[in-house]
Amino acid sequence: MKLSKRIENLPPYLFVQISKKIAEKRAKGEDVISFAIGDPDLPTPKHILAELCKAAEDPSNHRYPETEGLPVLRKAMAEWYQKRFGVKLNPDTEVLPLIGSKEGIGHAAWCFLDPGDIALVPNPAYPVYAISSQLAGAEVFNLPLNKGNNFLPNLEAIPQNILSKAKVLWINYPNNPTGAVAGLSFFQEVANFAAKHNLAVCHDGPYSEIAFDGYKPVSFLEADGAKDVGIEFHSLSKSYNMTGWRIGMAVGNAKMIDALRRFKSNLDSGIPQAIQLMAIAALNGSQEIINQNCAIYQRRRDRLVEALRNIGMEVTAPKASLYIWAPVPESYTSASFATELLDKTGVVVTPGTGYGTAGEGYIRLSLTVPDEQIEKGIAKLAGYKKSS
């Protein structure tokens, strides 16, 4: 059987490879501490689970849901955006529930790109931005993110011959993998740039509720004219510890939202209604879980940053997100240092090159590791310093 060229050319997904390597080590009886994957270890709050259990008992929730989601869910999403960011959204035309934001990100490329178009994609970045663009037949032009520019793309450096074919601009703040943040002035620059060059902006903002030291991330949609040029993807996964329930949202430009809705209606059957109802409980209920999460992640961030500095790494503590972006020691590549840490200590980190060529020289560590495992990992890192 011959597979399609798009599948033959599709690289293995980064985190599948990492999970496989961890499983192989553990199958051999090795003690492995993984800081590789950003999947919250904290439980979904009980009041949210209670709504799920209640909804699951109702036979009306056992049938096909609608692609566009329950009106009451779209209303809850719009009201949450109004309260959190001061952004007004029409729940009927500017809000679309998603089966996790990754699903919407993957589908967006098919809505806004034709073969031969160019997608402007940060590098390093969450791999799905580039992969989905390539699957849709578009070319990817990388926008390097580097420390010298606070891991923000230099939009004015994009060549005119690229801009003439570019249709989509991807941005993501608080950023994965760098942990960088962007203020309203940057988002305003993006909105103005997109309007000038007729670009559709896709902002991925799932980490807006994971921030430290009193910092409060803003939404791209707070910028003047942002809704005229783009949409924002958000997720309940990180905010409410709901990665396993698969629910997120796309909000913003009505034309883009309608395109995504039409595409999805031909490919999926929507989000199970019981999960939609638990999402309403999350959005409308107490938001104290967000403060509790941030306090836990900040404590873990501080412990890990200290441990990395103790083995000689020059690490900047992130203001937000679930990740520490750490430069590797001189004479190492991202991959060689990650491999040495795994072989010598049993600590798993993600090589920066897993997020693009501009990730060379860095590793990423996730804060979604139980405290006990964090301390074990720190002890292993201390042992690495003694042996090196």
Curated annotation (Swiss-Prot):
GO biological process: lysine biosynthetic process via diaminopimelate, diaminopimelate-aminotransferase pathway
Catalytic function, reaction form: (2S,6S)-2,6-diaminopimelate + 2-oxoglutarate = (S)-2,3,4,5-tetrahydrodipicolinate + L-glutamate + H2O + H(+)
EC number(s) recorded for this UniProt protein: 2.6.1.83
The keyword Transferase belongs to this UniProt entry's keyword annotation: yes
A Pfam entry, by short name: Aminotran_1_2
Biochemical pathway: Amino-acid biosynthesis; L-lysine biosynthesis via DAP pathway; LL-2,6-diaminopimelate from (S)-tetrahydrodipicolinate (aminotransferase route): step 1/1
PANTHER family named in the record: AMINO ACID AMINOTRANSFERASE, L-GLUTAMINE--4-(METHYLSULFANYL)-2-OXOBUTANOATE AMINOTRANSFERASE
Protein name: LL-diaminopimelate aminotransferase
Organism the protein comes from: Dehalococcoides mccartyi (strain ATCC BAA-2100 / JCM 16839 / KCTC 5957 / BAV1)
Lineage: Bacteria, Bacillati, Chloroflexota, Dehalococcoidia, Dehalococcoidales
Name of the coding gene: dapL
